[in-house]
């Protein structure tokens, strides 16, 4: 459903954000 899609997108965005932070440090 829509909610699982939102959760998947949030998970992916979270991983991308963590990777971005790792690049910055």
Swiss-Prot record:
Keywords: Amidation, Amphibian defense peptide, Antimicrobial, Secreted
Any single Gene Ontology cellular-component annotation: extracellular region
UniProt modified residues of type Valine amide: 25
Tissues in which the UniProt entry reports expression: Expressed by the skin glands.
InterPro entries assigned to the protein according to its UniProt record, in alphabetical order: Dermaseptin_dom
Any one GO BP annotation for this protein: defense response
Pfam families noted in UniProt: DD_K
Compartments in which it is found: Secreted
UniProt similarity note: Belongs to the frog skin active peptide (FSAP) family. Dermaseptin subfamily.
Function (record text): Has antimicrobial activity.
Protein name, as recorded: Dermaseptin-5.2TR
Source organism of this protein record: Phyllomedusa trinitatis
């Amino acid at each position: 459903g829509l909610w699982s899609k939102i959760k998947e997108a949030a998970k992916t965005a979270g991983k991308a954000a963590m990777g971005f932070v790792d690049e910055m440090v």
